[in-house]
């Protein structure tokens, strides 16, 4: 198991928490994923990303971007390629990022294209 850069994580933890929807993914959940080794953290000078490996019933294996914070240029040019290389080394055939719609535009030059659309409705009593 690779030990996480906990000091780097703590530096970006507030921004990562802000980027996540706490109703679905509270920051404590991300803490647990990183500490357990189920998710991997990459920290740069001005940005950080977290990803995990997901295996799908049809046999596909993907490196799945969970959350990112900081300067988008550093995320796109430096950190995402590190996560992709990690995924390739672990047998991943895909990289998937499920996030806000602005990421579609930001990641298009890096070969990312829309895959699915998630629709959400709040169910009230």
Model-derived features with residue positions:
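Acyl-donor binding region in acyl/amide transferases
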Residues: 60-108
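Active-site/acyl-donor-binding loops of N-acyltransferases
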Residues: 97-101, 105-125
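Active-site rim helix/loop that mediates acceptor-substrate recognition in acyltransferases
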Residues: 20-40
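Conserved donor-binding loop and adjoining core beta-sheet/short helix segment
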Residues: 35-74
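Short amphipathic alpha-helix that is part of the acyltransferase structural core
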Residues: 1-25
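Low-complexity, charged, repeat-rich alpha-helical/coil interaction segments
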Residues: 10-13, 42, 86, 92
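Short glycine/proline-enriched coil/turn segments at helix->beta-strand junctions
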Residues: 44-47, 91, 113-115
């Amino acid at each position: 198991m690779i030990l996480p850069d906990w000091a780097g994580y703590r530096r970006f933890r507030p921004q990562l928490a802000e980027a996540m929807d706490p109703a679905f993914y509270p920051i404590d959940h991300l803490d647990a994923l990183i500490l357990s080794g189920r998710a991997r953290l990459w920290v740069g000078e001005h940005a950080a990303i977290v990803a995990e490996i997901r295996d799908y019933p049809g046999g596909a294996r993907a490196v799945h971007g969970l959350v990112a914070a900081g300067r988008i240029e550093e995320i796109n040019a430096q950190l995402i390629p590190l996560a992709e290389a990690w995924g390739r080394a672990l047998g991943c055939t895909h990289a998937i990022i499920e996030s806000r719609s602005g990421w579609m535009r930001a990641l298009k030059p890096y070969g990312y294209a829309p895959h699915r659309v998630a629709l959400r409705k709040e169910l009230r009593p």
